[in-house]
């Protein structure tokens, strides 16, 4: 019995030794700050890559490792500039741009308005000779298109709606010309992340769909009101042009104005949460 016990003990210790690195990695991931994630994305070695078949731009799923932590990331290198493009709707868009740079700009803007927890961390990095955006791979269970198709109801409808209100405000702020349900990712516990902004930041100063502005988080509303053009320009230097920054600020003004009008009509409690 003692011999058998010792054999089982050795087996258990060996199993723990094999499993523990994965447990440590998982634990490390949960406590990484966003600055630590940025550092990892910028400096960790890219050990492998596989191209995705999902999405128009078909980003790459890369595996990175710094010797301690191994994690995947999404790499998008598209940077197209065309005189005009006929969209799927039949509309012709002049000065068409589809660029990875807008992913980085979107994250920078999200940091300024306090929504960076709803986007993956984006940085600029080169791979195989191509510059692109590299973002932290998210633990998503599905996207919004899947959720609707499968008729899945969020476990907490109020919390879900509050997240979606934020996404809608952000979408109006950045004027994404290619918003689609696959760009809203959902975790096991129904946390929402908004991804892929390569066709955002159009030069339009009007809102894309003002009816999407239903309610607004109080903190987000305050940060929108204090958003500074010079700070935005500095934080997105190299990723947004002066005209694109001006367009963001013009849309910001209209978003704030619309919510202020709604507050006057309905009362603050009906609009802000």
Q: Predicted segment positions?
A:
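Phosphate/dinucleotide-binding and metal-coordinating scaffold of catalytic cores
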Residues: 25-273
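Bacterial N-terminal signal peptides that target proteins for export
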Residues: 2-12
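Helix-centric, low-specificity signal for extended rod-like, repetitive segments
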Residues: 1-3, 244-245
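Bacterial N-terminal signal peptides
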Residues: 12-21
């Amino acid at each position: 019995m003692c011999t058998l016990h010792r054999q089982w003990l050795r087996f258990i210790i060996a199993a723990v030794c094999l499993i523990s690195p994965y447990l440590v990695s998982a634990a490390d991931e949960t406590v990484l700050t966003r600055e630590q994630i940025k550092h990892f994305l910028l400096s960790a070695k890219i050990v492998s890559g596989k191209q995705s078949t999902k999405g128009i731009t078909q980003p790459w799923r890369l595996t990175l490792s710094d010797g301690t932590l191994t994690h995947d990331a999404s790499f998008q290198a598209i940077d197209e500039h065309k005189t005009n493009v006929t969209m799927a709707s039949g509309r012709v868009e002049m000065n068409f741009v589809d660029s990875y740079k807008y992913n980085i700009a979107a994250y920078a803007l999200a940091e300024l308005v306090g929504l960076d927890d709803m986007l993956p961390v984006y940085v600029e990095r080169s791979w195989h000779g191509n510059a692109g955006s590299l973002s932290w791979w998210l633990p998503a269970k599905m996207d919004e298109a899947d959720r609707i198709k499968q008729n899945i109801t969020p476990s907490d409808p109020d919390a879900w709606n509050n997240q979606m209100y934020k996404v809608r405000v952000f979408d109006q702020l950045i004027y994404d010309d290619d918003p689609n349900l696959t760009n809203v990712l959902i975790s096991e516990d129904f946390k929402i992340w908004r991804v892929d902004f390569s066709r955002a930041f159009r030069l339009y100063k009007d809102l894309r769909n003002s009816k999407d502005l239903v309610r607004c988080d109080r903190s987000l509303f305050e940060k929108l009101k204090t958003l500074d053009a010079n700070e935005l320009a500095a934080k997105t230097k190299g990723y947004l042009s002066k005209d694109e920054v001006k367009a963001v600020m013009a849309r910001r003004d209209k978003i704030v104005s619309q919510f202020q009008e709604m507050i006057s009509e309905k009362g603050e409690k009906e609009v802000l949460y």
